[in-house]
Amino acid sequence: MNLFTPGPVNISVAAQQAIGRPRMFHHRSDQFRTMMTKLTSHLKNAFMTGGEVLTLTSSGTGAMEAAVSNLLSPGDRVLVPVSGKFSRRWAEICEAYGIDVIRTDLEPGDAPDADVIISALEADPEIHSVLLTHCETSTGSLTDLEPVCAAISHLEQASGREILKIADCITSLYVDELRMDDWGIDCAVAASQKGLLSPPGLAFVALGKRALDRLESNSSSAYYFDLWRYLRRKPPFTPAIPLVDATLASLEYLAGLGPEAVWQAGRSGAAALRLLAGAAEMKPVARRQASGVVAFWTEGLDTAKIGRALEREHYIIVAQGQAELKGRILRASPIGKSPAMLRGFATAFSGVLAKTGRTLDMDSIRAEFDRLLEDCAIWE
């Protein structure tokens, strides 16, 4: 089955081989400690941080909850720009912990820019943290974190406030450009099943100096997600050892390719999918578009029927719209997809659309499509 979903994605050959190895370590053994040390080193390089990166056995939402429960306290006031299902999740987690959430609601496909963020922060001096979503997976929109974080830092310097910058990078790590330290991100969270080309089940919390300082001064109500436990003893509980093995193997593979080549493959793969959608007269949902997922409006089409046909006839799975976008959009991801996979998707998508009466004019885009696929050859 070819997963064109924005997570889980098809895992790398390196991860497959690691899972297939008939070995198991005890989580207190020297062998496993060595494995965790290597994993953490690669994760620091992936986030581009000199801070701490902690590995949890959970989904990405677990990393989000760990960040909230350890860095924030009941009654704290935070800003959450909401542009879709996953940015809304930040707000829902915060509210579950008794945190006072100031929401900035955006239209589907929009992403918060520096002006929106700064306006909200200036209007309320009690806000001391901003929870951002790098890639809003429900719409494919990308928040430009570099200028947003720079604007927040400038406001901090001018006002004397400390405003923690916390980012969901679950669909952007090793997909879109991410430079945690250079951009001034204090805490970033991610998971194994997307850009790391690994099975689901591991989540990561990257902490810069200011986040570590906040962690030290904050009283957490968490137990399993108490990050001090992970800092003192890595890991504090029995981890998913085969997943650590597989994710380390995949990170070593990605490191060999280099982040710039991986980011470019993501950009070009996403552009190729947008080209296909455009040739079928489908418009993108996002104004500023991420590489990890391409979402496009499907006006006049039965999205569920298209999804079923792709799966049953071509063994390709795409994602439907969620919440208020259900039945209105389709979502596809180019993460880890080779030129052959993308060409196969183009053929299948064109054939399925033709049965609905919608034409995908492949001849008009073939030259540009093939040019974009050259950058995706790293996945062959």
Spans of features found by a protein language model:
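Conserved N-terminal alpha-helix of the aminotransferase class I/II PLP-enzyme fold
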Residues: 18-66, 89, 93
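Conserved PLP-dependent catalytic core of the aminotransferase class-I/II
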Residues: 38-47, 251-285, 308-309
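PLP-dependent enzyme catalytic core of the Aspartate aminotransferase-like
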Residues: 330-380
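Conserved PLP-binding active-site segment of the aspartate aminotransferase-like
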Residues: 295-300, 317-347
